[in-house]
Amino acid sequence: WDSRPVADNGPIENQNSPIDGANDGASGVAVLLELARNIDSLPEDVGVDIIFFDAEDLGVSEVENSFCLGSQYWAKNPHVPGYTAHFGILLDMVGGKKAKFYWEGNSKNWGSYILSHVWTIAQELGFSSRFITESTAPVIDDHAYVYEGTKIPMVDIIDYHHSSGFPEEWHTVNDNLENIHKPTLHAVGITLENTLLTPPPSLFY
C-alpha cells in the first residue's frame, strides 16, 4: 500500500531520495486489485475480504514494532469487532523479474497446511520455478501482527530467502516499473484465484 520513503539501501548519494516502490508496495496491491476485478468468477459461497495495510515500511530496524503500523492497528481494531477468517494470504514483493517464493518461517509455523496447498497449486499451474518448497527464515511482516492479534492462520508470499536476502532493488531507487515482471504478477494472481476456488482441504474437517 505504501512505500519506504527513502532509498536507504542504495548508494549513499541516493539514500535520501524517494522510491517508487513498484515491487515493494505496489505489486501486491496490483495483484489484489486484479483479483477483485475477477471476483465474480468465484462461487457465491466463497467469501473474500481484501485488506490494504498502510505504514508497513516506515520503521527503523533497531526499534521494535516500528514497522507494520497499519496491520498492528487493524489487528487490535478490526473493521468488524471479533472478525475472523479461515485463513489469510499476505503479498509482499510479488512482481520481481527474479522473484522466488519460499516457505517463510512464520507462515510454516502458523499455517503449514495453507503453505503446502498454495505452493502445490502454483506448481501444478507450472510455476514451480517461482514457488519453491524450501523453508527460509521468519520475517516480521504484516502477517505476523494479524496472526498475533486475531489467530487467523496467515501465510506470506514474499520474495525473500535468508541466504540471499531481499531483491537487489529493495529500498533503492531501482524499485521501479522497469524491474516489474508481468509473468511474475500473473503467476501469483492465478495461484491466488485457484486457491480461492479450491481452499485447503483441512478447512472442512
Question: Predicted regions span which residues?
Answer:
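Generic structural signal for helix capping and beta-alpha/helix-loop junctions
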Residues: 4, 60, 164-165
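A mature extracytoplasmic/lumenal domain signature
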Residues: 1, 52-54, 159-161
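A substrate-binding/cap region within the structured catalytic cores of diverse enzymes
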Residues: 7-11, 59-65, 117
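Active-site-adjacent substrate-binding region
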Residues: 87, 96-205
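Acidic/histidine-rich catalytic neighborhood of metal-dependent amide-processing enzymes
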Residues: 17-113, 142
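Soluble metallo-hydrolase cores and metallopeptidase-like ectodomains found primarily
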Residues: 1-18, 41, 191, 198-199
